[in-house]
Every structure is written in structure tokens, then in C-alpha cells.
Amino acid sequence: MIPDVSQALAWLEKHPQALQGIQRGLERETLRVNADGTLATTGHPPALGSALTHKWITTDFAEALLEFITPVDGDIEHMLTFMRDVHRYTARQLGDERMWPLSMPCYIAPGQDIELAQYGTSNVGRLKTLYREGLKNRYGALMQTISGVHYNFSLPMAFWQAKCGVEDAESGKEAISAGYFRSIRNYYRFGWVIPYLFGASPAICSSFLQGKPTTLPFEETGNGMYYLPYATSLRLSDLGYTNKSQSNLGITFNDLHEYVAGLKRAIKTPSEEYAKIGLQKDGKYLQINSNILQIENELYAPIRPKRVTRRGETPSDALLRGGIEYIEVRSLDINPFSPIGVDAQQVRFLDLFMVWCALADAPEMSSDELLCTRTNWNRVILEGRKPGLTLGIGCESAQFPLAQVGKDLFRDLRRVAQTLDSIHGGQAYQQVCDELLACFDDPELTFSARILRSMIEEGIGGTGRALADRYRTQLREEPLEILSEDDFIAERDASVARQKKVEAEDSEPFEALLARHA
């Protein structure tokens, strides 16, 4: 089932310098909660500066949903320590509040009023909040309080020079973009390995179902918890953050222009369903527009091609201008075993897997075939640890045992690990292979199995509260290592000044900005 990568691996072993200088970044979301686990109703803490313009600390959907961002980094330990410093400083600013350590929220009542993230009075700030109002009216607020980790990854220019013969980013943008699209197609085919190993949302609180009927064969505990015994990541299931209306958009990952055209079509195509919501009620805006996507960011995807945007530029225009610069991997649940929601083992695994995705052959995929890859993901998400579970290839009927496919994949990953270890010294990447390979013989070693044991005993709420308390104490007591308190104070003040500048420079009415998004 795994493509034959032997030639590409032999090439890599002859050109180890092609992997010198991999760049990464991390984003981690977490809900602010009270000591009893309920959602915090306070505003974004002033000590954390402006959520609109702060470089490292912002908010996602809700005012209580923090998002931490590291700068681009070539050093894994440095990046994780930076992320930990942001957590340490934030933990000291939250008073009695905690950071929820799980992807799925628990103590949110159906119909509870969840305050949307606020970004000030500028047009761009108001548009961000209105976009969230649209998400709430389209999908419900509860779905938007789910948290995850995003891992951003780029291969060094040396890789593309050696592999494709390009000279630089500008002249080589078509070849580099084609290479990243190959990675994305392989990710759709084999990325289910991420929820298998690291999925950590095998259960949900009953409030999450909001009384809606479900066909999933949930088992129920006495404390209002529903779980599937072999599930890995309900966050990635239809109960979590997905969007059924997007499944037939026909967006494909074969070619940059084709991908962008599909995206632009979706933000210009009216939706009958969303038109029913309306654009305004009693003078209050309800969504940016009633198209299938209000803006490009609304496209739900487990992985995205990205380029840093310039001011006033949409993500797709940035891609057309400069090609794909990096890839954003979006399938990681919050790691409940780490105070910062992610650890070095996961980052090293993702390095290995994304390099493999860039090396393995990946035929072009139609939109139908993309939908077929979803079958494997759904199996792994809902019953990934089930003994004897099998997976298919694309739309073909042949089935292969997940455990065997996983072991075959790790045989390749070990060779990538040897190359990366030869560059960095030590055995860190090979050690990750040893640790994770064991999960295919014993699914009880996976994140989902480990956290489910605790949840069955303590409930989701009990597990979440205990971890939140432990990490709060731990982070508050640890000294800062890379950033200083002065750095955080300076960025707080600078971010507030930047927001005021944006607000002062607004020259057009908000309605004119909205008209451009119609």
C-alpha cells in the first residue's frame, strides 16, 4: 500500500545536506477556563496586549480562546522553549484562570453565550469579529471552541536545488509549489497516521451533542461522558471541526492555479443555506456574505499550502504571487501530556513524515479521489485502535491491515531519521521511530488509549481539571528561558500601539470594505 520510495531514499542518503535547514513554527490554541473548568467570561487579559497585533499571543474564535504562535525556527528545542516561555508568562497573567489542556471543551452548556473574539474598532478588527459571527451563525459556537495545534513546515532551498535543479525561490516557484502539492496529496493518503499516534480526543462531554441524534455507537459513563472504545480523534470527526457543505467544492491539490481557482470560486459562490441566515438583523451584521465561504480561511482542511501575506493581500493572491512557501499541518489534537500541548517527539515525527511525503511519488488526485481518502481518515478517527482494522488505497477495494501499513511506513521513516541524525548528531530521530513503531504492535501506547483510561476513571472534566491545575502550577513556577518579562511588556505595549495606529489610519467606511467581500 505504501509507494516505493527506495530510489528517493537512496538519493537522500547521497544528498543529506538537502535537509540541512528545515524551518518550522507552531501555533497552539487553548481555552481560558475557571478553576471549576467552566469557560472564562473575562475579556482578553490586558497584560497580553492587543490580540489584533501581538506577535506571539492572539485569540482564535472566542474571546476566551487563546492562541500562541512561535516565530519561524530552525531549532526544535529552541522553538519549544520559546512556546513554553509564552505559556509561562501567560499562566502568570491569568490570575485564577487556567488553560484547558484538552482539544474538546467540556463545561459549556448548550446555547451558552460564548463571546466572540474582539479586535478593536478598526475595519480589519471589525471584519475579524464579523467573520466569527458568521461562523457562529453557520456552524454553532460550540464547534468553534475546539482547540488544536498547527505545525508549519518548510524544506530548505538546498532540498529544491538538489531535487528539482531550481536556482532560487523566485525562478523555481512553480517546481517548489508542485513539490509541496505532492506532499499534500501524500498527506491526504497517509496522514491518518497522525490521529492514530497522537489523536487525544476519544471522548466528548454529553453537552457537545446538544441533544442531536447521532448514529455513532457511543458508550456512556455515569458522568455525562460519551466515548467510542477505539476512537482516536473525535475532534477530526463530523462531530468536531468539519464542514459538510464544503465536501463537494471540488478543490484539488494538483496545481497551484487550479487550487486557487477552486478557492476563489468557493468565496464567490452563493449558498442557499447561508442566505437564509441573512446579512443583517436589527442593524447587526450576521456574516460577511452568504457565499459558501465568507473568506478563504473558512475552508476546512487538515493541511494547507501557505505563503506569508503582504498587507491587504488574500492568502490565495500571496500563493499566486510567490508560490507555496510552507505547509500548515492542522491535524494535531492538543497533547494532554505536555504543559504546552505539543512535544519534541511529535515535532520530530512530523519532520520525518513531511520529508517522506515530499519524497514519495504521488499521482494527481481528482476531487472524487480526495473524498475517498476521507474513508481511511474516518476509520482511524472513529476506530483506529480496533484490532485487525484495515485501510484501503484511494477508491480501490483492496484492504490492508493498519498495523502493517504503519510498520511499512516506519521502515522508510527510519532511513529519513538516519539522514537527519547524521546532520544533527545523536540519535533523536531514530529514537522517535523506535518509540512510535511500538504503537502499531500495542495500540494501548497511543495518546488516545492513554488519555481514555484516565477519562473513563475521572471523566473528561476531572481529567481536564487535574491536568489544568498541574500545568498551571508548573508553568507559573518555571523561570523564563529565552524571553524576559521585559520582552513581554515591550511587546504588550508595542502591540497596543500598533492597534491604535491601524485604527487611526482607517480611511474608508466599514460598509465599503464589506462590499468588496460580497
Curated annotation (Swiss-Prot):
Q: Which Pfam families match?
A: Glu_cys_ligase
Q: What is catalysed by this protein?
A: L-cysteine + L-glutamate + ATP = gamma-L-glutamyl-L-cysteine + ADP + phosphate + H(+)
Q: What is its EC number?
A: 6.3.2.2
A cellular-component GO term for this protein: cytosol
Give the pathway: Sulfur metabolism; glutathione biosynthesis; glutathione from L-cysteine and L-glutamate: step 1/2
- Write the record's keywords in alphabetical order, separated by commas: ATP-binding, Glutathione biosynthesis, Ligase, Nucleotide-binding
Q: What class of enzyme is it?
A: ligase
Recorded superkingdom: Bacteria
Please give the SUPFAM superfamilies that the UniProt record associates with this protein: Glutamine synthetase/guanido kinase
GO MF entry, a single one: glutamate-cysteine ligase activity
Q: Which GO terms describe its biological process?
A: glutathione biosynthetic process
- What family does the entry list? Belongs to the glutamate--cysteine ligase type 1 family. Type 1 subfamily.
**Name the record gives this protein:** Glutamate--cysteine ligase
Source organism per entry reads Klebsiella pneumoniae subsp. pneumoniae (strain ATCC 700721 / MGH 78578)
